Amino acid sequence: MVARAAFPKGCLAMRVRDALGPLFDDEIFRSAFGVRGRPGVAPGRLALVSVLQFAENLTDRQAAHAVRARIDWKYLLGLELTDPGFDFTVLTGFRDRLLAHGLEEKILDLLLARLNELELVSGRGRQRTDSTHILAAVRDLNRLEFVGETLRAALEAVAVAAPEWLASWMPGGWQEQYGARVDSYRLPSDESERTQLTWRIAADGYQFLEAAVGVSAPAWLPQVSAVGILRTVWLQQFQRTITDGVQEVAWRGKDELPPSRARITSPYDPDSRNAVKRGSAWDGYKVHITETCDAKETGQPHLITHVVTTDATVGDPVVVDEIHDQLDAKGLLPGEHLMDAGYISAELLLTAPSQRDVRVIGPVRPMTRRTVQATGYDKASFSIDWDARRAICPAGAHSRYWTEGLDNNQRSAIRIRFATETCAPCPSRGQCTNSTRYGRQLTVRPQDQDAVLERVRAEQTTEEWKAVYAIRSGVEGTIHQAVTAAGTRRTRYTGLRKTALAHVLTATAVNLLRLDAWWTGQPLAPTRTSHLAALDLAA
């Protein structure tokens, strides 16, 4: 009665309780809690608080305060007005328990199961997927800052784990050198001084790593996480040679560094990776969001059905099978799945319809640069004789070389090359190849894959295909809502698994926001159009 008096028109929390009832059963989370000790806070309530926390982009302290102070939250949680709530650290412990027992997906799954019962979400419809970058919860560091901060982080960790050993071993001056965080503001500006500082930090790091495995050090010291990170970073960033007892240290060159997928970018988040996409670089992760998009046909709201979180270097095509597997397990596998070109591959176009009865809709990339520029002879200008294993050019010449193997992405590919003496005298050579030493080269997929690529390239030029694919762009609005409402752009936590849990909570929160808008008749926002673009110049 008090909540009704305070919110006569209702609010999100009250409408969720009225429409969905108790969402999260305590029994689902039972394995994450012990059977002895003091009674704890009901895990179902903690799950609901965690979702509301992300729906309103609150900190743990703010969420715990809302449980104590807000009538609408008490209504949703089924608490008495006099309930004192709980300490904010309980939320941290709850997330840790979810991760420790592999229950991080359950919160979104339980909501989807309830919505499935209410026929608000179902499989075999149309869904769409897109990804966005996630910034790690660490500051950006240049190379010198990075190695200095990595050594400082290791010393900080050992100062807590083995203070007596570190105090007895640590050389003089290290407290002043590594006591404060490494920052460009405090680093020397002179290049020669920066170089000397780099070699000093490198030498100090090697000295510490040798001492950590020495006789006087605790046997377990190398197992400290920060010490292991220091060892890995020094291996990745430096190369050391010892000649006649003299140690020489140098940076690893660009070609000597490990690939981005293996290279640590921060001592405080070893799962974070660096990636570059369309000229934009970031350290962190990537999240793939899948949502329903058949509202016009069903009258149902657009709801997120699955999220996948990876490090920043994982390519989009890699996650498609996982998305389909998880959606199938939930009974939410779509009949049509819209994706951008980054996800599309010949293998996917072949296997998704045959193995899962899913029609994947997305553009296939142009075959060659000449296709994009619409000049010269592209691959479509050549005919392929699969039985004779050769290609025939527009002038009627036959290729000489046919090599089967893998492309740079480890996918099956066939490389076809024309002989130099065949192409050299050809009057159309300038329209065919820029090479002055070799004949024209083609790279094609195996016959079945090549056929499906040609079919899709023809389909994507039709107005019908374009109208269906245009629906895909709406998922970018979902990403925008997750970023603005829940602060998804920068992760709150360090580590891949904690970040993935945050994205599950975000997806669940966005679904509640979407449901509330649907219940209250709030229409979808139209595409933004500037006043200038909207002018009718013909008037």
Model-identified regions with their sequence ranges:
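Basic, low-complexity segments
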Residues: 1-35
